[in-house]
Amino acid sequence: MIRAGVIGCGDVARRAYIPGVQELGDRITVVAAFDTIEERAQDIADMFPDATAYTSMDAFLAHEGGMDLVFNLTPAPLHRDITARVMEAGYRVYTEKPIASTVDEARELMEIAARNDKPIICAPATMVTARFRWMQDFLASGGIGRPIAIKAQIGGMGPAQWAEYFGDPRVFYQKGVGPLIDTGVYMLHVMTGLLGPARRIHAVGGITIPERETSIPRLKGEKIQVTTPDMFSINIDFGNETYGHLFSSFAMPNSKAPMFELFADRGAISVDRMQWYNGNGASDVFRLDDPAADWVSVTPPPLPTGGILESGILHAIQHIEDGEPLALTADAATHVLEIMNAAHRSLETGDAIEITTTFDAQPAIPVASD
């Protein structure tokens, strides 16, 4: 049984991580919960029989009995400092995205992890969902030939419009977050996970709606000043005549477009926008050599948990206890971080930006439901 600690007991903890731990409760449990707001930490601790709530980080890190894994679920600008402090205390960390704010910060974290011999596990977990495990394996087997391009779109209006959002929506519209770091990151991990490291990017975009009004009942009517770009259109060159395009936005009231489409020289794969968050969900496949010449829905063997966030918890368990190769690596997360930061620079300068980091592409992990 993995003994987990949770730092940050806000919306993402309550909405996904805690239900995910409960769903996998025969293999993992929460023993310690930290938040600067005592009520939040206590609410999480009360969900587990032997958990303790903390508002002191020192006390949390000194939790009696220790912890096998600590989830860093704090706001994005805090990730680097929290992860470093937890690792320096000797613990293994699973951090929400992004790994840090800069590539240099991410490299510093990887150095600490290497000294501890405990690699950082980095969200998002898109590539370890059943769908994308299957897709990676399908492409590696030549199922539709050589991948040529990916077109991805992800967005909405951001958390200010989520009536049931539990946290503070303002941070998502400020420097250090925005749509690319909040949700575009999911598709960037898919694009690089399937096509490999990017070599160059060019982006256009900006602040299209400079003031937001919240729809969250407890904050209804409050105004948010947007200080970071809320729309990105990014072209990505992966080399070897392979390309990608990502549209990432907090200025998209709705859309009927697919969330993700991959084109290869003998076929295509499409994922509906209403399907993408279900990691066990179907993908539509088109093959040029299919006599019917039509789309076919393919559903992979399901994993015990299907959510994109929750799938990462399962992968962490299987990595720590079963020796499953780590797919959610710090190298891959750092590469995606550089792409996101390069997109911001490209908006400012109008230039194409060379990407300097890389990562070793991980082989597909077989889909297994046990």
What are these regions (language model features)?
Residues 189-280, 312-322, 360-370:
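Contiguous beta-strand/loop segments that form the cofactor/metal-binding neighborhood of enzyme cores
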Residues 12, 36-39, 302-314:
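Active-site loop of classical SDR/Rossmann-like NAD(P)-dependent oxidoreductases
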Residues 108-126, 145-150:
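Rossmann-fold dehydrogenase core element
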Residues 55, 95, 120-122, 246, ...:
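Hydrophobic residues in well-ordered beta-strands that form the structural core
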Residues 1-48:
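N-terminal Rossmann-like dinucleotide-binding module
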Residues 69-71, 118, 316-370:
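C-terminal helix-rich "cap/oligomerization" subdomain common to oxidoreductases
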